[in-house]
């Protein structure tokens, strides 16, 4: 009797659609299919754009139950790159992000809200410059499917604005904030 109940339970579990369960992904930084970019005003006349070259993370995503999705990212702040070595050295210094003391920034989601049509609000705790604050990333599901190497992938884009004072970072020139743009592609585990 126990064997037949076990077999029945196993058969039911195997018959459940795979889409009914969240899938876990590793962010594809090795294949350069993900980026964390920033844009900050330069003296109020133009913008400086840059990126963080080194980061890692993972996410769990279920199209049928968005609220169960999760995101975790770790950014190496010493990898900040604005395509200008002297400026990068200054931004990484104690005058601004103090990457020597705070070499990592982390984001851990606490809530994902489905806004419809592939749009999501991803709220979580960002730790930057030794300060942890809640932020919301306005994200969009780009798509998911098989890749040419036999794996499965899912991709998202997102934006958020960070107020520097919220993280005890001095104002950079005339800008009190930095705009972040995220391109995230994950490979299913």
UniProtKB/Swiss-Prot annotation:
<comment type="similarity">
    <text>Belongs to the UPF0312 family. Type 1 subfamily.</text>
</comment>
<keyword id="KW-0732">Signal</keyword>
<dbReference type="InterPro" id="IPR036761">
    <property type="entry name" value="TTHA0802/YceI-like_sf"/>
</dbReference>
<dbReference type="GO" id="GO:0042597">
    <property type="term" value="C:periplasmic space"/>
</dbReference>
<dbReference type="InterPro" id="IPR007372">
    <property type="entry name" value="Lipid/polyisoprenoid-bd_YceI"/>
</dbReference>
<feature type="signal peptide">
    <location>
        <begin position="1"/>
        <end position="22"/>
    </location>
</feature>
<dbReference type="InterPro" id="IPR023480">
    <property type="entry name" value="UPF0312/YceI"/>
</dbReference>
<dbReference type="Pfam" id="PF04264">
    <property type="entry name" value="YceI"/>
</dbReference>
<keyword id="KW-0574">Periplasm</keyword>
<protein>
    <recommendedName>
        <fullName>UPF0312 protein VPA0850</fullName>
    </recommendedName>
</protein>
